[in-house]
Amino acid sequence: MLLRLKGNYIWPAMWKSFVPRPGNIFFTDDPGNMQLADDYGIVVSTSHHEPMQRATNEWNETLKGPWDWERNKGNVTQFMEEGVQRAGKNETYFTLGMRGEGDGPIQADDPVVILEDVFKTQREILAKYHGNESAANRTSLCGILEDEDANTGLLEVWTIYKEVMTYYAAGLLPPDDVTLMFTDDNWGNIQRLPLANETERSGGIGVRLSSGFLAVAAPSPDVLVDLGDN
């Protein structure tokens, strides 16, 4: 279906389904899913709440403590690293950052300091398995960037969702080669669109608009097309 819609980028659904625990997990329901997507030219990423190619449903089954960077950094780091290992050399858009337990805000005195450490650790993991490929983040994904001279390196994205925008406004910024993904709130409300200086980043920018059953008032597909054209 994605190819028929002329798309080549997917975030597998993060929510639990009605199938038995742990629910649908793109990466493990069929271990060949990632390779099949790569064979068809589909770039696999994960939602704003699921960094480094790991699914929320996977963490829920680990029994390795809370999803909390301050209290459980070792286990969370190991979980993320296993996602990078599993992705291998398949074309992947690695999600950076993290939110708190249950896709809520990080519960800490200074989330910005925590996320700075998260970024640092995630970049170290990516460098461990991909070397200097993470030094550039340009691609012809969706036909947006097609400069033949552009260095096509590892793809990384940080999604600026809900309270994360306040961290960004406070000065939190990932490396320049990381794509900034601006997004709505599931209900079609977006805080703002990228500015000119943001579009000049080597990692580029993106905009995510929701269309799904979680928020029934989300924009219809035809509205999304009009917004994309504009």
Segments (PLM) and residue ranges:
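Gly/Pro-rich turn-and-neighbor structural signature
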Residues: 23, 31, 39, 62-202
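Feature activates predominantly on carbohydrate-active enzymes
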Residues: 1-66, 88, 157-161, 172-188, ...
